[in-house]
A protein has these predicted regions:
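N-terminal active-site segment of His-dependent metallophosphoesterases
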Residues: 1-64, 72-75
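Conserved catalytic scaffold of divalent metal-dependent phosphoesterases
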Residues: 9-11, 71, 82-114
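Hydrophobic/aromatic beta-strand patches that form the interior of the parallel beta-sheet core
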Residues: 36, 64-66, 96, 113
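Amphipathic alpha-helical segments in well-structured domains
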Residues: 52, 81-82
């Protein structure tokens, strides 16, 4: 099983670059079976979740993520606690925080644990 692993997309800071599209393109070129993003997608939950939605729509393989420190902040809601923000992410099935996913290919299994 080919696992693609990337982190620190920072789509808000890098808004002038097609990072989501390029990530999907490179992962497909590498014949990725599953893509894992190891944090720091954006500094707002809405942008992070939109990016994951878009990335999944461009990929023919599952996309999972674990929020990083930047994903756990919210510039638009300074009074939001990390516990509240974490609850938002944990509702998303693609978020690995506190979860595990078992994937299989060719009779072999891989556990992704967040």
């Amino acid at each position: 099983m080919r696992v693609g692993l990337i982190s620190d997309l920072h789509i808000d800071i890098n808004k002038d670059y097609p990072i989501v599209e390029l990530t999907a393109e490179v992962a497909a070129e590498q014949r990725t079976d599953v893509l894992v993003i190891a944090g720091d997608i954006s500094e707002t939950q809405a942008q992070t979740l939109q990016a994951i939605d878009k990335l999944q729509s461009l990929c023919e393989f599952p996309v999972y993520y674990v929020p990083g420190n930047h994903d756990m902040w919210n510039k638009n809601c300074p009074e939001c606690t990390t516990e509240e923000i974490d609850c938002i992410y944990r509702e998303d099935l693609r978020c690995l925080s506190g979860k595990q996913v078992i994937l299989g290919k060719d009779g072999r299994q891989l556990a992704l644990v967040g």
